[in-house]
Amino acid sequence: MKKALLYSIFALSIASTTLTSCEDIFGGFLDKQPSNELTGEQVFSDWNLTVQFHLDTYNFLRHGAGRISTTWLDAATDLAETSYGNGVRTSFNIGNFYGGSGASELVDTWEHYYRGIRKCNMLLTRIEEVPQNPADSEDKYNRDKKNYIAEARFLRAYFYWELFLRYGPIPIVTEVLDPDGDLMSKYTIRPTTKEYVVDFILEELKSCEDDLLDYKTAWTSSSAGRIGQPMACALRSRIMLFMASPRYSSESGITWQQAANVAKEFIDNYGTNFALFNDKDATGATLGIENYTNALLRTAYQGSNKEVIFYRNDDKQNWGNIKNDTPVGEGGNGGLCPSQNLVDMYDMADGSSPFNEYDATGAPVYTGNSMIPAINPASGYNDAQPWSNRDPRLAATVLYQGAEWGSGSIDVRFGMRDNPRGNANSTPTGYYVRKYIPESILSVEHSGTAYRLWTIIRYAEIMMNYAEAMNEVNGPCDEVYSMLDQIRERAGISGSVANRTDLNTKDKMRNFIHKERTIEFVFEEHRVWDVRRWNVATEALSRDIYGVNVAENGAITRKV
């Protein structure tokens, strides 16, 4: 199966440099105040109501698990297919983001984030007129007001960044628009990428950073999920990396060295507060699978997970929240099903490469009509057991034949527990997802609850940003080796990248970093944007999607 390529998603919605109407630009969110809601005058005449209004803006941060009509964004890439859903399953499996239910990623995103931006603009425009809460001191009032203004600026910048990824540079609105006013004279010309990203988003993040909550305050339980100073620097690191990448560098003017500098700025300024989740057992051995799992599922409350930087705070979840992405043998609906393409990207547990050659998408090279890349015989890789003796992150991410999980072991042989006859939700790839699915929910007949907070940025990304940028500046070097080795070591992979003779050039290391970034952040909504900024979306999204069949005797064969 191939996925059709939508190289520039925003072209589907904005086909020219001018926009034609107020409704086209801003959707329906400029409708007048419903009669059953508080008016702006009521909200901004009371400090407590103003605070509630502001904190509600955090709800515009989205959770990525099953967010697109029960489907994940990575199901629209080469990393997975989706088995559960109606129109969206068909749309995503053929790469049609705009057809059927898959359209929600484009249409809903536009209105969703512009609503969030409007709330930010309302807060920023009117907070100075809100009277002080009589119960607060003047110092507290001024301190809180400063924090809320900075948070609104951060959130607005983040919302604009998410819109940029999908639509390119669009109108920058920093005022509260009047639905009865003349909008066409001001908001019909799109800014350049530099004006939109460098001059606005990056400047907003940099200038609001000092006024945000400091680390100590933002990472307490009472402030859980609030925007803190490290988040602004972390988001700048992500955006700078994008702007230095081939897709955007000529428009932005940002260099790889500048991107490296911002990643290093985070490490220097906040590195004592953050770290990879890296627990050891009683003997000092790394708990690779547990570390990788906990990096996402352990909450950041009270510093219990120092890897998480920026996240969406949520209540605990239950069986109903994860059912759509659990194996059918467990009573679930299949959902996100990893591809063999993803499985092929993982190294061996000893740090060696199972295949001889990798391309700029991070994937091994599939030659001609072969579904199996050329195997590196020194690695010990066996395609009859493609998950055996691999990077522990594979076992923490993918449920494969024989894996112990939930109430039993995975069995995807035809007609068996996880691939029963007549069940349309059975995996089309031979795999189910394990990452981001809290297994504690399955306890006591699925009556458990657990946190599954959506991580937007974690410390591993800052390290990977630094490694990628430094390789582009200097080629393979100590800074690159150090970042990659730390990320791989905490996952339980032995051997230093510096000792790999197959990674001795900038080009080879680039392909390796693309591979490492893909598997480290798989199903965290990175791949679909990374392949575009690397200018390799055509190669990544037009190739066949592979899976496996498991015969009655357990024999493995690949399939398209």
PLM ranges: what are they?
Residues 46-51, 55-64, 86-167, 187-199, ...:
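Conserved, well-structured interaction surfaces
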